A protein has these predicted regions:
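Conserved active-site alpha-helix within GNAT-family acetyltransferase domains
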Residues: 93-111
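Short amphipathic alpha-helix that is part of the acyltransferase structural core
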Residues: 1-25, 124-130
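C-terminal "cap" of GNAT-fold acetyltransferases
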Residues: 109-130
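Conserved acetyl-CoA-binding loop-helix of GNAT-fold acetyltransferases
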Residues: 64-81
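Conserved donor-binding loop and adjoining core beta-sheet/short helix segment
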Residues: 29-67
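Short glycine-aromatic motifs
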Residues: 2, 28, 104-106
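Conserved acyl-donor/pantetheine-binding loop and adjacent beta-alpha core of acyl/acetyltransferases
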Residues: 19-24, 44, 56, 118
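Conserved GNAT acetyl-CoA-binding A-motif
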Residues: 80-93
Length: 130
């Protein structure tokens, strides 16, 4: 079973980040993706006046699965949107452009991955660029 859950304990966040090969940053919010109770990935993100930012988005070092990563990315964006922040950026190192675009991001004129979350979760299919 696929689960995407917030990481509420900073010690757990630090341990899970290590398993995904990313630096733990205490000031960041985080989600974890699990399949049948096994960690598949971690997303660390933040929100500010300029929008939400996915800072780290990494799968476990011993494997990659598209679906848990996709759902985790959408969950982080939904949380950002529910907090009243309606612009998001994907600033995490990630070489999987297909995944980044599937989550909903596209490059802006500066080459940065960005998306407008306004009404995105009311009708996500309406926003598809495919």
């Amino acid at each position: 079973m696929l689960e995407v859950l917030p990481i509420q304990d900073k010690q757990e966040q630090e341990a899970l980040c290590a398993r995904c090969g990313i630096e733990f940053r205490t000031e960041l919010l985080a989600y974890k993706a699990l399949v049948d109770g096994e960690l598949r990935g971690v997303c660390q993100f933040t929100m500010g006046a300029d929008g939400g930012r996915i800072v780290d988005f990494a799968h476990v070092t011993d494997g990659y699965e598209f679906e848990p990563m996709f759902v985790m990315g959408r969950a982080a964006l939904n949380f950002i949107d529910l907090c009243g922040v309606h612009r998001a950026y994907f600033d995490a190192p990630c070489d999987n452009e297909t995944l980044i675009k599937a989550i909903g991001f596209s490059r802006n004129s500066d080459g940065r991955y960005e998306m407008d979350l306004t009404d995105f979760f009311k009708e996500p299919c309406k926003h598809s660029k495919n």
